[in-house]
Amino acid sequence: MYQLRDVKLSRNTRTLLQIDELTLPAHGLTVVLGHNGSGKSTLLKMLAGQLKPDQGQVLFNHHLVHAFAPRELAKHIAYMPQQIPQPALMQVRELVELGRFAWRGWLQRWQSDDRQAIAQSMDDTDVAHLAQHALDEISGGERQRAWLAMLLAQNAKMLLLDEPSSALDLAHQYQLMNLLRAQVAKQSCAVIAILHDLNLALRYADRIIALQRGTIWFDGTPVNLLTHPALSDLYGIDLDILPREGKHAVAVVA
């Protein structure tokens, strides 16, 4: 579980993020929305221990995130950045195997649970057939799925994903979201994902947090977001709510 208290981060007099109080539970799928530059990636980097606030505290399970040793933190938190590295000549399977480093280190032998975690995560993300391919010879979407496989192999109880569907085709976007929902249910874990697709957020999220200019503009359920009187203000464009078979979709009004 995360707790943020009086958190503020600024750069050159510009406030990137300012959150008085925020609690993120240890279970469920939380989607973070907001326009470009609203502070979404900054928030995720802070949760992952990649950024330290100028003031305030970011606590994970009642301990300061930046006080964890990297390997110990990796047992609890798996993080996919927005710009994923592309190591030259590394094969997909080798990348996925890195997910087990927190548990085995570099020198220990693989155990059966390591091999099982690696194989299962590659099957779940549809990259098993790419195991021997180099990362720089597969597509951006395939590379994104390979990174997700590494995170799943890590077996952390908190997944932090910065735009995990940005390079995926439509079918794999929904496959990804179904997989994340299944992980939450099966592993009793938590997922915090940044998305730009409002419809995906409304369909799959348990909770939505929307940022605007570095502050929390909305925090609640998808249903509550749909009825928010200023929903169009979130992206600065007219939106229309379309009811469909007991659910809702959002359309841009031309």
Question: Which ranges hold each PLM region?
Answer:
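Catalytic Walker B motif of ABC-type/P-loop ATPase nucleotide-binding domains
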Residues: 159-163
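Conserved ABC ATPase "signature" C-loop
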Residues: 213-214
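Conserved ABC transporter NBD signature motif
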Residues: 56-64, 73
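Conserved ABC ATPase signature
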Residues: 109, 134-138, 142
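Helix-to-loop junction immediately C-terminal to a conserved catalytic motif
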Residues: 48
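ABC ATPase nucleotide-binding domains
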Residues: 234-254
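The feature captures the beta-strand-to-loop junction immediately N-terminal to the Walker
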Residues: 33-35
